Amino acid sequence: MTSFQPQSSYSRDDLIECGKGNLFGPGNAQLPLPNMLMLDRITHISHTGGEFGKGEIIAELDISPDLWFFECHFPGDPVMPGCLGLDAMWQLVGFFLGWKGNLGRGRALGCGELKFTGQILPTAKKITYHIHLKRVIERKLIMGIADGRVSCDGKDIYFAHDLRVGLFQNTDSF
């Protein structure tokens, strides 16, 4: 493990360092690099708090019409793919596991229920992700289970229940 010192917030530069494997150490939890990094900042992360008192994360992504996905999804009808918002929530659960000092490479393991009740258009200004940890297993298996919400300019539009992310020492047979 590196000499990682947990903070309560992280800048985009910090998140990119995480994507390079420099935050939690080589071979441990890391975020994807742009373009798949769906966060600009983590404004709050805590071991306590959230709806279940087991931890929470609040993060943001600034929206601009020149983001890569608007050009291809869909021509003449640009909208952010919902799967990117879902992936951002998985990214945050994995980040939380590494932030807590757990070792291993992160992998999304699924989610229970997922609902989309709105969309993210190029005219939007900001997405906010709010993750509520329900359970963190820290034994031979390292896994986080959380509920998440995505809001666009203050309106809740995506809801995910039982997001699951695990950390694995070896992903060869995954």
Swiss-Prot record:
PANTHER family: 3-HYDROXYACYL-[ACYL-CARRIER-PROTEIN] DEHYDRATASE, 3-HYDROXYDECANOYL-[ACYL-CARRIER-PROTEIN] DEHYDRATASE. Homodimer. It catalyses: a (3R)-hydroxyacyl-[ACP] = a (2E)-enoyl-[ACP] + H2O; (3R)-hydroxydecanoyl-[ACP] = (2E)-decenoyl-[ACP] + H2O; (2E)-decenoyl-[ACP] = (3Z)-decenoyl-[ACP]. This is 3-hydroxydecanoyl-[acyl-carrier-protein] dehydratase. Its main location: cytoplasm. Its EC number is 4.2.1.59, 5.3.3.14. Pathway: Lipid metabolism; fatty acid biosynthesis. Belongs to the thioester dehydratase family. FabA subfamily. Keywords: Cytoplasm, Fatty acid biosynthesis, Fatty acid metabolism, Isomerase, Lipid biosynthesis, Lipid metabolism, Lyase. It comes from the Bacteria. Gene3D superfamilies: Hotdog Thioesterase (3.10.129.10). It is found in: Cytoplasm. GO terms for cellular component: cytoplasm. The active site is at H73. One of its GO terms (biological process) is unsaturated fatty acid biosynthetic process. Necessary for the introduction of cis unsaturation into fatty acids. Catalyzes the dehydration of (3R)-3-hydroxydecanoyl-ACP to E-(2)-decenoyl-ACP and then its isomerization to Z-(3)-decenoyl-ACP. Can catalyze the dehydratase reaction for beta-hydroxyacyl-ACPs with saturated chain lengths up to 16:0, being most active on intermediate chain length. GO terms for molecular function: (3R)-hydroxyacyl-[acyl-carrier-protein] dehydratase activity; trans-2-decenoyl-acyl-carrier-protein isomerase activity.
